[in-house]
Amino acid sequence: EDLSLVGQPENDYDTGDDBTAADPDSNNTAAALDVRRPLPSGTRVRRPPLRHRRLAPGAVMSRDPPASPRPQEAQKAIRDEGGCMLPESDLGVLCPTGCELREELLKQRDPVRYKISMLKQNLTYFINSFDRMASDSNTLKQNVQTLRRRLNSRSSTHVNAQKEIENRYKEVKIRIESTVAGSLRSMKSVLEHLRAKMQRMEEAIKTQKELCSAPCTVNCRVPVVSGMHCEDIYRNGGRTSEAYYIQPDLFSEPYKVFCDMESHGGGWTVVQNRVDGSSNFARDWNTYKAEFGNIAFGNGKSICNIPGEYWLGTKTVHQLTKQHTQQVLFDMSDWEGSSVYAQYASFRPENEAQGYRLWVEDYSGNAGNALLEGATQLMGDNRTMTIHNGMQFSTFDRDNDNWNPGDPTKHCSREDAGGWWYNRCHAANPNGRYYWGGIYTKEQADYGTDDGVVWMNWKGSWYSMRQMAMKLRPKWP
């Protein structure tokens, strides 16, 4: 749907900071950044040197060699947390990225908009033509009146000329009136056709929204192998990247996740994924706490090995980190085909009572240390206010950011279009608005802020990623 600029907001960063400077290696200058929201003091982060390794063979939790195939047992029907119906007890269920009907509607949107635009242009043309004809008629009438006055003052020899002019005036008037009437009829017909078409579109959109709001059911077989998390499944023999059931503890019911068994050694539980903009990430606190989106969909061969667009839930993310210290991996790709990553050896959100406050340590990768160091293009307080470590989770209805706490007009989540661990406001915004093509502008954003799927240390404020995924894996001692 079309978005309009609500208003020109205040700059998010302190443009008067004397120590703001541009990073020569960045693709974006400081002038292109959203310099805003000054912070009186910085954040000091203690980063103890951490290393991690997998257990040696024979030790506890070591990866066993792949077990010999066993006869496949009938899989127990498990209650689906996503709301889909299990067609059979031995079939898994996973929801696709988007419904086919929604995709078809999106394909038809641009042609319909183009036709509407052309109809509007025709309407404008008819209105302008009518105005010109009305102006011409008034001018002609004035000329006739002038001539009449002149003829009245002259001799009777000019009476015939006067009658001829009047007759011609009547002819022109009749012609103009008939033309205007025809134009008005044409305009009325066009408007009625346009109104009917828009009504049909509104009804179709309403129907598609109702269909797409319900979880979609797919006939994908979920592998029998399971575990506490994807790393556990990897050690139990699961080697393909697809949807699995996990059960982090005995007190919780199993639920579906997408496991990345290939990237950076495999065993990653994907807790967030952005691929096509099919899911709206501007959600409230309770929705982020639970789960939303589509975990995965099939490839036509009854295998759910294509990840969808979703958020696994802050409650679930916290649950995964209670049993083991977790690493976090951010994989991202741009619209030109390049990919980078950012990995942190320790990732720990606190519980809901603490606002799921985030703590990360020990960065590695080539995307830039956005969570611990903030946006490297900025300096001083402008940079400090973009650090995410130590921040609470915020949504548009739960303002926990560090931007003038208590002031409802200063709200990062509302302006940046997603839920995240905002400071004042961000160097990374994985849950922001999805923009096709990468580059976007202030005019496209609702509040004029950099609200895209952003990782500033790689592509700056005004480039939205094509793909962004957040993955967890236990860090073994």
Curated annotation (Swiss-Prot):
Database matches in Pfam families: Fib_alpha (PF08702), Fibrinogen_C (PF00147)
UniProt subcellular location: Secreted
Cystine connections: C220-C304, C230-C259, C412-C425
Primary location recorded for the protein, binned into one broad class: secreted
Domain Fibrinogen C-terminal positions: 221-476
GO biological process: blood coagulation, common pathway; fibrinolysis; platelet aggregation; positive regulation of heterotypic cell-cell adhesion; protein polymerization
GO CC terms in record: fibrinogen complex
Sample GO molecular function, one term: signaling receptor binding
Compositional bias (Basic residues): 44-55
Region (Disordered): 1-76
SMART domains: FBG, Fib_alpha
The UniProt record lists the keyword Disulfide bond: yes
Summary of subunit composition and partner proteins: Heterohexamer; disulfide linked. Contains 2 sets of 3 non-identical chains (alpha, beta and gamma). The 2 heterotrimers are in head to head conformation with the N-termini in a small central domain.
Free-text note regarding domains: A long coiled coil structure formed by 3 polypeptide chains connects the central nodule to the C-terminal domains (distal nodules). The long C-terminal ends of the alpha chains fold back, contributing a fourth strand to the coiled coil structure.
Cited NCBIfam families: GGGWT_bact
The protein's name in its UniProt record: Fibrinogen beta chain
Organism this protein belongs to: Petromyzon marinus
